[in-house]
Amino acid sequence: MPNSHWTPADIPDLKGRTALITGANSGIGYRTAQVLAEHGARILLTGRRPDALADAARRLRADVPGAHLETVELDLGDLAAIRDAAAPLAAGETLDLLINNAGVMDVPERRLTRDGLELTVGTNHLGHFALTAHLMPSLQRSSAARVVTVSAVAAAWRAGDLADLMSERSYRPMSAYAKSKRANVVFTQELARRFAGSAHRAVVVHPGSAVTNLQRHTSASRTGRLFVALASRTLMGSPDGAAWPSLFAATHPEVTNGAYLGPAGRDQTSGTPEPVRLPAGADGPDLGAWLWRESERLTGVTFPVPQT
């Protein structure tokens, strides 16, 4: 996968391709949508708040005149809303790129989604699990669909152990975040196994570190405040560079099914995307099968891609 000099300028013409990006109102998601639109892709811009979504659409049309763009209201913390948002697309749309980008982090107290799931894992993993399942008919209409899920360096933290997935025994904000990001990796590895033998690809990325709206809860957590304060001085880049792994995963012709991509720079904080080491045990088929079953149980969604 030669990529030492890759930049978004190397992205091929995407006319005729449709991409849905979650959390595209701002930050990494917005930049991802902008670059894909610049290369001709039709963009399905999703977000939870109608006002922020409309504002993002206005900005994108100004940034990319002539962009082929539609908006989809989507709350990843509401399973019924996910189903309803996906239904019209699943009924007849062809989806070539699904970029599972949205997320929350460092929620100071244990909160629940509308469906009674712990908010961080419920949004970052289970919401995207359900969305991907509901959109599978659209993805399968593509000749070579890609599902790109955005994880984080936190996936490798010891606190990311998936035992007590819903943090029912104890809750710590950054532990819940690490669990959700490890679940993103494990989910992608299992989806890649189920895509084996097809032209479809499941890819997981981490963006390094970037200052974005993802940190909006950190003011309430001392640990979160310290993490963001230190990282913003030393490690964090802009959403522009942080979008590169997602863009590379979505468009580079040599990206392989099951790849894990991150920045090539110092401590994987920034730089050109490259394959990086998976968190220990994250590609185990037993863990993948368990998380899949548990995710189906918690969401009530049956994923239409059978285990191989």
What are these regions (language model features)?
Residues 1-218, 298-306:
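Rossmann-fold NAD(P)H-dependent dehydrogenase/reductase core
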Residues 160-165, 217-222, 263-274:
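Short, flexible, mixed-charge acidic loops at enzyme active sites
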Residues 167-168, 221-230:
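A short C-terminal helix-loop "cap" of Rossmann-like NAD(P)-dependent dehydrogenase/epimerase domains
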Residues 52, 223, 287:
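Short acidic-hydrophobic sequence patches enriched in Asp/Glu that either
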Residues 180, 229-279, 283-289, 293, ...:
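C-terminal helical subdomain
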